[in-house]
Design a protein with these regions (language model features):
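Beta/alpha (TIM)-barrel catalytic core signal, keyed to glycine-rich beta->alpha loops juxtaposed to Asp/Glu
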Residues: 130, 134-330
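Conserved beta-strand positions
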Residues: 16-18, 51, 86, 124-127, ...
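Short, acidic/polar
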Residues: 28-41, 100-117, 165-170
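N-terminal binding-site loop/beta-alpha segment at the start of enzyme catalytic domains
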Residues: 1-82, 148
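A short acidic, helix-capping loop that chelates divalent metal ions and anchors anionic groups
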Residues: 22-25, 55-58, 91-97, 191-196
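Active-site mouth loops of central-metabolism enzymes
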Residues: 20-32, 92-104, 128, 133-134
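Short, well-ordered coil/turn segments that N-cap beta-strands
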Residues: 9-14, 45-47, 78-82, 119-123, ...
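Active-site groove signature of glycoside hydrolases
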Residues: 114-135
């Protein structure tokens, strides 16, 4: 698997998302299914997992099941060379309107994350939500404290807007590369080409100005929902086609507002690339983000181990392959 060298870290070019792992239970068939996916990713050379302290709390055990699942797998397989990104400070499922973006919540989540993962130090720890009423300097200060304690390698943000990221970077100053690992917001080819988009539930997109800023400042972006939940492949199942005028014909069952002229163009290109390469349109849309001329590692989740091979094949494509050079990627 291709790797990305960024700020002294060698990271797999495709990050495996684990949000649903363990949510159906931490034993028996659900655990075996998760282990099979993790094993396949590792055997392919994958060394980068994304999780969060909140992942699984909506599941059958109402606990941080994803972190616990990963911890069980790491221990069972004796694996010590996996880079883990986890997250803290998400609101609780039963208290949606109560912010947990504060020092005490961060430290409590960190203690539980380390215990569940079985790690003395979590390589990358992100704040999962923002509270714009909080001074960004307060947030940065307790994140720096966690790094200085040795309990995390570096911190970053998830679901933060440009002004907040910029203020944090300015506040860190010359220490930025030591402390700040990157940003994880929603970003996908389909979303990028959808025009105005306001994600639900306090999530934030990678806007074009934010992407430009991260490129200028060499900030790593770890996009979640990087394949838009398979939006382009879902169009096929919905029977959507392209008319003589180059526009969509039919309706999408998921995110119909994304049916823009630009996404119709993307749909045509992806269909052609799929026929030429055999890669799914979903995998190709992840490769689109990975091909950006800035540090971007898409986070993808799979329900079956064999799906990982499709992503790996798509990631090997170069800009000049199969017409990708004619695709205006940037």
């Amino acid at each position: 698997m291709k790797t990305v060298l960024h700020n002294g870290r060698t990271l797999s070019g495709l990050c495996l998302g684990t949000a649903s792992m363990g949510s159906e239970g931490l034993s028996g068939a659900p655990l075996q299914k998760a282990f099979a996916i993790l094993d396949t990713y590792y055997e392919m050379g994958g060394r980068f997992l994304d999780t969060a302290n909140v992942y699984g709390r909506w599941g059958v055990d109402h606990t941080n099941a994803s972190e616990k699942c990963i911890g069980l797998w790491l221990s069972d397989r004796g694996i010590t060379d996996m880079t883990i990104t986890s997250k803290c400070c998400h609101y609780l499922p039963e208290a949606h309107d109560t912010s947990r973006v504060d020092r005490d919540s961060a430290l409590a989540d960190l203690a539980e994350s380390r215990r569940s993962l079985g790690m003395e130090q979590i390589p990358i720890y992100l704040l999962h939500r923002d509270n714009r009423e909080r001074d960004i300097r307060y947030i940065v200060d307790f994140c720096v404290e966690m790094v200085d304690s040795g309990k995390i390698g570096a911190f970053g943000f998830s679901n933060y807007r440009l002004d907040r990221v910029q203020a944090a970077i300015d506040y860190l100053g010359a220490d930025r590369k030591r402390y700040f690992a990157g940003l994880s917001n929603e970003w996908s080819l389909a979303m990028e080409s959808a025009g105005a988009y306001d994600p639900p539930d306090g999530m934030e997109p990678v806007t074009k100005p934010l992407a430009r800023y991260c490129a200028e400042e060499d900030i790593l972006i770890l996009p979640f929902s990087a394949v838009a939940h398979g939006w382009f492949d879902k169009l096929i199942r919905d029977g959507v086609t392209i008319g003589a005028d180059g526009r969509f014909v039919g309706s999408a069952s998921y995110r119909p507002g994304w049916m823009t002229a630009e996404n119709a163009r993307n749909y045509r290109i992806l269909q052609a690339l799929h026929k030429e390469t055999g890669c799914s349109m979903t995998a190709l849309s992840a490769a689109y983000l990975a091909g950006k001329r800035q540090p971007v590692i898409p986070i993808v989740s799979v329900s079956r181990p064999e799906q990982l091979a499709e992503y790996a094949a798509a990631m090997e494509l170069k800009r000049t392959d199969v017409g990708l050079g004619t695709w205006q990627i940037d």
